[in-house]
């Protein structure tokens, strides 16, 4: 037992996902971070902020129907104090998603105006949906695709 193997604290799949996010950031206009409204601290990726840098971001507090409404409101206020828009949503029913596009357009209003000045009126907004496993990324994407099935293959879930 003279050989001791070290335990890698940062698994390969996490490093791969980090690289995929970093390389795809230049292709998107905004990052939508999906977190579980019941456990907002533990359902966040602590390195996400350093990965996305200054890219515009919105936080979506999913499963808000199962969370304490008062605590969820406190979290929305917390994010507001940190200059981040947060919306309580429920991907299964669609509750709260009617606020998503108006909020995104507001966050990107200067960028949208710049596109329009360049003649790119109606340019699609490209969004990267990120979050730890089981927060509802696929459910959100499917809901936004009008109930279509985006499938797990379109989502990197690590």
Regions flagged by a language model, labelled:
Residues 58, 64-132, 145, 150:
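Canonical P-loop GTPase G-domain recognition
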Residues 13-18, 40, 119-122, 146-158:
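Switch I (effector-binding) loop of TRAFAC-class P-loop GTPase G-domains
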Residues 1-54:
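N-terminal accessory targeting/assembly segments
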Residues 32-35, 87-88, 151-154:
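Short catalytic-loop micro-motif centered on adjacent basic/acidic residues
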Residues 137:
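Conserved lysine of the Walker
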Residues 35, 44, 62-63, 131:
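A secondary-structure boundary/capping signal
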Residues 5, 9, 63, 88:
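Conserved short-loop catalytic and cofactor-binding motifs
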């Amino acid at each position: 037992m003279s050989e001791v193997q070290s335990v890698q604290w940062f698994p390969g799949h996490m490093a791969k996902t980090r690289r995929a996010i970093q390389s795809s950031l230049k292709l998107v206009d905004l990052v939508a971070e999906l977190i579980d409204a019941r456990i907002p601290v533990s359902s966040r990726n602590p390195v996400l902020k350093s990965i996305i840098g200054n890219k515009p971001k919105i936080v979506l507090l999913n499963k808000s129907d199962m969370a304490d409404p008062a605590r969820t409101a406190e979290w929305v206020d917390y994010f507001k104090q940190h200059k981040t828009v947060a919306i309580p949503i429920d991907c299964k029913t669609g509750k709260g998603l009617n606020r998503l596009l108006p909020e995104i357009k507001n966050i990107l209003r200067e960028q949208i105006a710049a596109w329009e000045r360049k003649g790119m009126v109606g340019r699609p907004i490209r969004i990267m949906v990120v979050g730890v496993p089981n927060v509802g990324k696929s459910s959100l994407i499917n809901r936004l695709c009008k109930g279509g099935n985006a499938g797990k293959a379109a989502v990197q879930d690590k």
